[in-house]
């Protein structure tokens, strides 16, 4: 019997990480957690180490590492604790590792994910910011290393399942007319426009269908998440922004569709549970049980669709503009959004000001080419500085 595949889970204490470990635990003969990383919920990381017995755990700083190492030793575990970005890159690229779940939220996940790519690992990509920030460089690294890149976002995983196997030859060459990227519309789809100025972080995080972390929940409410997914889809499937159409589908049962030139439209359906795309990517090209209940079409009963209102969701408009501009624009969009959303969650800015901050940053800074990773992080830093200046200027 062959050994279980060794899986590094970057962002193990987040919702994607926990769902990944749930799927892994259902198939101990196939998968073993090799390394787990956590950022803030370190008591939870300790509990995960006790349950899954990884070779390594990674935490952000040395003090936390000492505390976790002491706790693990006291529990009789041999798990070794590593520190910071260097530790993340080490467990992402380790020779023993077969696949890496890249689920660290935001720009912080880029370097470890690239380390896994350059080491030729199978990449389960949940960190959409990695592609948004450095799309051309990232895909170039994938091609150079021969790494297998499998999307975890439910929408991109759905598109992947609906695409022909040889879609890398170009969408027009395989008969694809367009990608239909579905969105729930979030908690504010029908909120009166006058009330949006006063919505709270808790309201923004109350997603009607999905259980997610707070940052991505706010992105879903503003539809910036869908904008980032539009950019990600362009890189994953070599599509032009004009070939990706966003469709609001409140039930979140159809996770995305692919429209073919012969009039066929293929869709992937399922209950809104991230274990489905995770299991699909872990086992690809095979299929395994994810623990997700079968879809009951009779209970769903109806499927609704509508066009997104860009006045209600200006972040979607800004993301499409950044996708069309290319180069540094998506990286700056992402960085400005991260600063603005953090300020909103801290109660320093209002919900509608998130888009205002992003738009100002994009208008202030010219678009430049990103020829290397240093240029990517320079664009990221510039956008964060400009967003911070907006906060300071407005007394936030």
From Swiss-Prot:
EC number: 1.1.1.267
Binding site for 1-deoxy-D-xylulose 5-phosphate: 128, 154-155, 184, 207, 220, 225-226, 229
Reactions the enzyme catalyzes: 2-C-methyl-D-erythritol 4-phosphate + NADP(+) = 1-deoxy-D-xylulose 5-phosphate + NADPH + H(+)
Pathway: Isoprenoid biosynthesis; isopentenyl diphosphate biosynthesis via DXP pathway; isopentenyl diphosphate from 1-deoxy-D-xylulose 5-phosphate: step 1/6
Residues where Mn(2+) binds: 153, 155, 229
InterPro entries hit by this protein: DXP_reductoisomerase, DXP_reductoisomerase_C, DXP_reductoisomerase_N, DXPR_C, DXPR_C_sf, NAD(P)-bd_dom_sf
Residues that, per the record, bind NADPH: 13-16, 127, 129, 213
A GO biological process held by the record: isopentenyl diphosphate biosynthetic process, methylerythritol 4-phosphate pathway involved in terpenoid biosynthetic process
Listed GO MF terms: 1-deoxy-D-xylulose-5-phosphate reductoisomerase activity; manganese ion binding; NADPH binding
Primary enzyme class: oxidoreductase
Family according to the record: Belongs to the DXR family.
HAMAP family: DXP_reductoisom
Role according to the record: Catalyzes the NADPH-dependent rearrangement and reduction of 1-deoxy-D-xylulose-5-phosphate (DXP) to 2-C-methyl-D-erythritol 4-phosphate (MEP).
Protein name according to UniProt: 1-deoxy-D-xylulose 5-phosphate reductoisomerase
Source organism per UniProt: Pseudomonas fluorescens (strain Pf0-1)
